[in-house]
Every structure is written in structure tokens, then in C-alpha cells.
């Protein structure tokens, strides 16, 4: 049986709108680091006027069925998807009944994506955070989250965030960690340390205070 909110979300966004979200979400199925892109993905969904339910339907039933196999490929695609190929593949995936909202497709989705479901949960949490902020502050907030994520996961942090250090620290302690700490990887391929991740952010915040 299809949940009412999933059925509504399935066909609500226009094809032009959803194709841009397809391209964005598919980045998170590449064989490369993308956790720093989570806030930007959430911001694009919010800017597009999507509800969390609509974004979830696009992630679960359109993008994941088309590109989930790349997560398990020995030599997975990492440089980026060809736009036309990706759009055609997702349109094709949408035609299969198994990829339409329902209890069975939800089960298949969880089997397919496994650990990558955590990325969606983080996108949804960032969407909720951004939707709760005044519209005029959302770009600044998304940029601050991106800066924190880049430092947390040891990537190039980019430009200095416009939030003052005290607000940035509160954002990190009160909101960021709840969203991003579950994404720290501890598996057979690599082992990250939550302590080391936190130390990088604390060092970056200290550098901002001292500058």
C-alpha cells in the first residue's frame, strides 16, 4: 500500500524541476567524497520549494534505483555523471512498478542503498534546519554548514563563513553534530575517528577566533 504523502510527492514537482534535483542527488552516489555537499543539496531542495516528503520520494524512488549500483562497483564512477545519460536512466527507472512508492519499494530501497541512507537523513535534517530559518538567512546558514562539514571530514573548507565565530560554534555544537556525526565512517574500507573530526573543527574555529 502506498502511503498518502508518498503518493502525493511522487508526481508533484515538475519534470524540469525534478531533473535538476536528480543531478544534485546523484552526486551522492559517486565513488568519491560528497558529504560536504549535503548542505548544498538541502539548500537546493528548499530553494526549489520542495517539501521533505517530495525530496524523499525523488531520492528513494527515482535517483536511488538508477544509480545505486555505483555504490558497490569495484571501479565506480567518480568524476561525475553525464547529464543526458543520467536523466534518461532515471526516466526509465521511473517506469518500473518496483520503483514506485510503496512498502515493497521502500524495502528494496533500504537493501540497495544501505549505508547511503544516512546521507539522505542528513539532507532531510539540513532541509528542516534551513526551512526553520528566515529565508534571508538560509544562504548564509547553508554556507556555514558546508564550511563545518568540509573541516569535519578533512576537505578544503573554502571561503571563510560570514557567521561570527560564536554563532558558528553554537551551530556546530547544537545542530551540526547531531546531523553529521552519524556519517563518520567506521568500516573495513576506512576508519574515521569522531574525536579527530571534532578536533579539526575546533582547530578551525580557534583559527577564526585568533585571526
Regions found by a protein language model. Give the residues of each.
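Small-residue-enriched hydrophobic alpha-helices in membranes
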Residues: 1-15, 42-167, 173-175, 179-207
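Short intrinsically disordered terminal tails
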Residues: 210-211
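Amphipathic alpha-helical packing elements
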Residues: 17-50, 55
Amino acid at each position: 500500500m502506498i502511503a498518502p504523502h508518498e503518493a502525493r510527492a511522487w508526481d508533484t514537482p515538475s519534470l524540469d524541476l525534478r531533473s535538476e534535483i536528480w543531478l544534485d542527488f546523484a552526486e551522492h552516489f559517486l565513488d568519491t567524497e560528497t558529504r560536504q555537499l549535503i548542505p548544498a543539496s538541502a539548500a537546493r531542495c528548499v530553494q526549489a520549494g520542495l517539501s521533505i516528503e517530495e525530496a524523499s520520494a525523488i531520492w528513494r524512488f527515482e535517483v536511488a534505483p538508477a544509480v545505486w549500483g555505483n555504490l558497490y562497483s569495484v571501479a565506480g564512477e567518480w568524476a561525475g555523471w553525464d547529464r543526458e545519460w543520467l536523466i534518461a536512466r532515471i526516466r526509465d527507472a521511473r517506469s518500473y512498478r518496483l520503483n514506485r512508492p510503496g512498502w515493497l519499494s521502500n524495502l528494496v530501497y533500504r537493501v540497495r542503498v544501505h549505508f547511503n541512507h544516512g546521507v539522505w537523513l542528513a539532507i532531510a535534517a539540513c532541509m528542516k534546519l534551513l526551512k526553520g530559518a528566515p529565508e534571508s538567512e538560509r544562504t548564509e546558514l547553508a554556507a556555514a554548514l558546508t564550511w563545518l562539514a568540509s573541516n569535519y571530514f578533512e576537505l578544503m573548507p573554502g571561503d571563510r563563513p560570514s557567521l561570527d565565530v560564536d554563532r558558528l560554534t553554537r551551530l556546530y555544537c547544537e545542530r551540526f553534530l547531531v546531523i553529521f556525526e552519524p556519517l563518520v565512517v567506521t568500516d573495513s574500507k576506512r576508519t574515521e575517528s569522531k574525536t579527530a573530526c571534532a578536533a579539526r573543527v575546533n582547530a578551525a574555529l580557534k583559527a577564526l577566533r585568533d585571526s
